[in-house]
Amino acid sequence: MAKTSLKVKQQRTQKYQTREYSRCKICGRPHAYLRKFGICRICFRELAYKGQIPGVKKASW
């Protein structure tokens, strides 16, 4: 319930631009957000392991 209400709260237009913040499109997490993909690091890792993000593969050196 709390996460749902935070998602709704974040969707409203803020009075000032600096108050807006980005959230993961999948889980709604506000921290560790990757702008390029629009998701958080945890969701990114899961999708990358499943091969659902084109051009991303596990690095090894």
Curated annotation (Swiss-Prot):
Source superkingdom: Bacteria
Any one cellular-component term (Gene Ontology): small ribosomal subunit
Pfam families with a match to the protein in the record: Ribosomal_S14
Gene3D superfamilies: 30s Ribosomal Protein S14, Chain N
Cofactor(s) essential for the protein: Zn(2+)
Zinc found in the keyword field: yes
Chain sites annotated for binding Zn(2+): 24, 27, 40, 43
A single MF term (Gene Ontology): rRNA binding
InterPro entries, per database record: Ribosomal_uS14 (IPR001209), Ribosomal_uS14_bact (IPR023053), Ribosomal_uS14_CS (IPR018271), Ribosomal_uS14_sf (IPR043140)
Cofactor: how bound: Binds 1 zinc ion per subunit.
Keyword terms of this UniProt record: Metal-binding, Ribonucleoprotein, Ribosomal protein, RNA-binding, rRNA-binding, Zinc
BP GO terms, sorted: translation
Family, similarity comment: Belongs to the universal ribosomal protein uS14 family. Zinc-binding uS14 subfamily.
Assembly description: Part of the 30S ribosomal subunit. Contacts proteins S3 and S10.
General function of this protein: Binds 16S rRNA, required for the assembly of 30S particles and may also be responsible for determining the conformation of the 16S rRNA at the A site.
HAMAP family tied to this protein: Ribosomal_uS14_2_B (MF_01364_B)
Record protein name field: Small ribosomal subunit protein uS14
Organism of derivation: Alkaliphilus oremlandii (strain OhILAs)
Gene of this entry: rpsZ
